[in-house]
């Protein structure tokens, strides 16, 4: 039993995935055919023994609520375990006021009721694997007030432009948090993952609300960096931040490569998801599939190359799919020519 409860946050108002986000939150996006993006943070928590998890959602919660259900498929449905969907009403027409702090403050009584002394906060829009037991123990052993998880990259001028970065000293103490503005290639990308005591978390929420109704959690942590002992811990392995359409596409396509996928998937660290009873994919005569991820329940008659195909798709004869992500239950076929 972990000494921490978990919080999975919704994406910030600055994150826009055009073409998808107007229909569902990023956590409910299809990922690699069979998963949803939110499966990764919840699986990390479940595998780490965290069985009391709050999932925050701001808009269009239906698809996320249907996928999460009671949480049984995440292996957290014990007598004490509970997966809670926390609704945060958008209280202002101006999104700048609809922050994560506003969501936490609106549900602060539920946070205060938690019996665990620590909280681990992770985003619903980043994909990675991490043992939070080790992260929590590192936090406790260090004596830090707050521990932040980061991933070092060497392509920050072109990628991760909607993310925060950590400025660290030689002892990996966090000196400040700021936006990645593409001014340098090597950066420590903040993975929006925090470890701290429940009491400090509540204190920061209330402090932020007093300073400004526009404050976010990264901003109040940055504001407090001079007074608190804040440490950074480096993450190893696969990491993707879904903050726009290109990053969503690239995250899916990159995992077609087996070596890349090995940095995320491990038989000893399962990624749980809602299962669907469906037959194996059928490959009919004339089908051609190369370097692709094909989910269950599909019917393939055409050509698929370097693509991710969701569950229950039909690729009809003559159709050619290349370098694409096809969402579940899609039908791809060649249109009949229009006769005048």
Residue ranges and their predicted role:
Residues 1-10, 209-335, 339:
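Left-handed beta-helix
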């Amino acid at each position: 039993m972990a000494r921490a409860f978990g919080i999975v946050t919704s994406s910030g108002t600055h994150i826009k995935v055009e073409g998808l986000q107007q229909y569902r939150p990023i956590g409910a996006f299809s990922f690699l055919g069979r998963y949803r993006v939110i499966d990764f943070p919840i699986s990390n928590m479940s595998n780490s023994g965290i069985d009391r998890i709050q999932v925050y959602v701001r808009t269009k919660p239906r698809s996320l609520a249907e996928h999460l259900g009671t949480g049984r498929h995440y292996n957290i449905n014990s007598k004490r375990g509970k997966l809670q969907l926390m609704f945060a009403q958008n209280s202002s027409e101006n999104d700048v006021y609809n922050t994560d702090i506003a969501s936490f403050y609106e549900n602060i009584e539920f946070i205060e009721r938690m019996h665990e002394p620590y909280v681990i906060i992770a985003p619903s829009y980043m994909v990675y694997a991490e043992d939070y037991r080790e992260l929590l123990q590192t936090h406790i052993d260090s004596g830090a007030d707050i521990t932040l998880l980061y991933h070092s990259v060497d392509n920050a001028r072109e990628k991760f432009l909607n993310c925060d970065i950590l400025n660290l000293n030689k002892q990996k103490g966090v000196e400040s948090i700021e936006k990645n503005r593409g001014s340098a290639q090597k950066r420590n990308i903040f993975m929006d993952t925090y470890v701290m005591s429940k009491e400090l978390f509540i204190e920061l929420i209330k402090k932020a609300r007093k300073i400004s109704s526009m404050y976010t959690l990264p901003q109040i942590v940055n504001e407090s960096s001079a007074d608190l002992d804040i440490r950074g811990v480096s993450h190893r392995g696969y990491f993707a931040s879904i903050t726009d359409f290109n990053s969503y596409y690239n995250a899916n396509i990159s995992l077609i490569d087996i070596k890349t996928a090995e940095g995320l998937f491990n038989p000893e660290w399962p990624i749980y998801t809602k299962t669907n009873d469906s037959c194996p994919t059928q490959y009919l005569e004339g089908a051609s599939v190369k370097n692709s991820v094909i989910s269950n329940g599909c019917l393939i008659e055409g050509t698929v190359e370097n693509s991710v195909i969701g569950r229950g798709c039909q690729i009809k004869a003559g159709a050619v799919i290349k370098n694409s992500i096809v969402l579940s239950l899609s039908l791809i076929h060649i249109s009949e020519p229009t006769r005048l």
